[in-house]
């Protein structure tokens, strides 16, 4: 009965992290949906008018080359909820001036870019001019949602520019980034797995201890029965001494000797 109580308490301890994770996820989803509703109501109209020219499906212009670098972050690790910087380079190999209008990016699921995860910050550059045969570098700082689950995602970035009054865009990055949890070396999943492993080891230790205790008790019981039998036989011999049966037995023994 005691072992059952211990096992029940251990199971409760193991289940408590699951309940906390589920509760945190539900709270995060509710908070995220609330933020999206509020932000959408207050900013949709203004952003739609201001960034309409930067959010169109545009083609690239021949002679414009782009490059992207994650400074001091070759692994492309992006902490959720924290700012991440990348450098966007644009080289003008054409025959006319290029005016850079802005930079935009978005996060997608790696297996299907039609499934949008998050639109990132729109950076307006106000037609920064790049003469022919020259290049320029622009820092772009973005932050993915703090509620985004750690894992691999695809980042797609565009730089929008103007050539002779007509807008164009070129892709400067289309690849995988690794979203990680911020504020610690261990993620929530790692802590949970570590707790689960320790709990299983404790349960295994309790089970082994109970088996050893059971075998020890059985050994003690068997040894007591043997001692009791010997003492009973000795007491019977003492009780038979001096009785008729004992005398008869001794007489038969003497006759056999004669």
Swiss-Prot record:
Transmembrane segments: 191-209
Record PTM text: Phosphorylated in its cytoplasmic tail.
This protein's UniProt keywords: Calcium, Endoplasmic reticulum, Glycoprotein, Membrane, Phosphoprotein, Signal, Transmembrane, Transmembrane helix
One Pfam family of this chain: TRAP_alpha
Topological region Lumenal: 25-190
Glycan attachment residues as annotated in the record: 57, 119, 127
Cellular component GO terms, alphabetical: chloroplast thylakoid membrane; endoplasmic reticulum; endoplasmic reticulum membrane; Golgi apparatus; mitochondrion; plant-type vacuole; plasma membrane; vacuole
Predominant subcellular localization, coarse grouping: endoplasmic reticulum
Cytoplasm as UniProt keyword: no
Alphabetical list of InterPro entries matching this protein: TRAP_alpha
Topological region Cytoplasmic: 210-258
Membrane topology of this protein: Single-pass type I membrane protein
Leader sequence segment: 1-24
Compartments in which it is found: Endoplasmic reticulum membrane
Function: TRAP proteins are part of a complex whose function is to bind calcium to the ER membrane and thereby regulate the retention of ER resident proteins. May be involved in the recycling of the translocation apparatus after completion of the translocation process or may function as a membrane-bound chaperone facilitating folding of translocated proteins.
Miscellaneous comment in the UniProt entry for this protein: Seems to bind calcium.
Comment on protein domains: Shows a remarkable charge distribution with the N-terminus being highly negatively charged, and the cytoplasmic C-terminus positively charged.
Similarity-based family: Belongs to the TRAP-alpha family.
Oligomer status and interactors: Heterotetramer of TRAP-alpha, TRAP-beta, TRAP-delta and TRAP-gamma.
Designated name of the protein: Translocon-associated protein subunit alpha
Organism of this sequence: Arabidopsis thaliana
């Amino acid at each position: 009965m005691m072992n059952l109580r211990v096992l029940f308490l251990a199971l409760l301890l193991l289940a408590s992290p699951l309940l906390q994770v589920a509760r945190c996820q539900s709270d995060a989803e509710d908070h995220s949906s609330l933020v999206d509703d509020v932000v959408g109501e207050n900013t949709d109209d203004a952003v739609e008018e201001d960034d309409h020219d930067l959010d169109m499906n545009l083609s690239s212009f021949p002679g414009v080359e782009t490059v992207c670098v994650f400074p001091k972050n070759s692994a492309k690790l992006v902490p959720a909820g924290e700012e991440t910087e990348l450098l966007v380079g644009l080289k003008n190999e054409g025959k006319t001036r290029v005016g850079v209008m802005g930079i935009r990016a978005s996060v997608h699921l790696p297996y299907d870019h039609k499934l949008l995860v998050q639109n990132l910050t729109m950076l307006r550059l106000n037609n920064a001019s790049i003469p022919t045969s020259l290049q320029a570098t622009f820092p772009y700082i973005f932050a993915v949602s703090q509620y985004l689950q750690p894992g691999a995602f695809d980042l797609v970035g565009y730089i929008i520019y103007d050539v002779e009054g007509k807008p164009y865009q070129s892709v400067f990055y289309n690849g995988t980034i690794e979203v990680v949890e911020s504020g610690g070396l261990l993620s929530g999943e790692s802590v949970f797995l570590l707790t689960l492993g320790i709990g299983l080891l404790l349960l295994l230790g309790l089970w082994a201890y109970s088996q050893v205790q059971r075998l020890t008790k059985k050994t003690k019981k068997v040894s007591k029965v043997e001692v009791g039998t010997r003492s009973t036989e000795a007491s019977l011999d003492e009780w038979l001494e001096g009785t008729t049966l004992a005398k008869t037995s001794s007489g038969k023994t003497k006759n056999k000797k004669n």
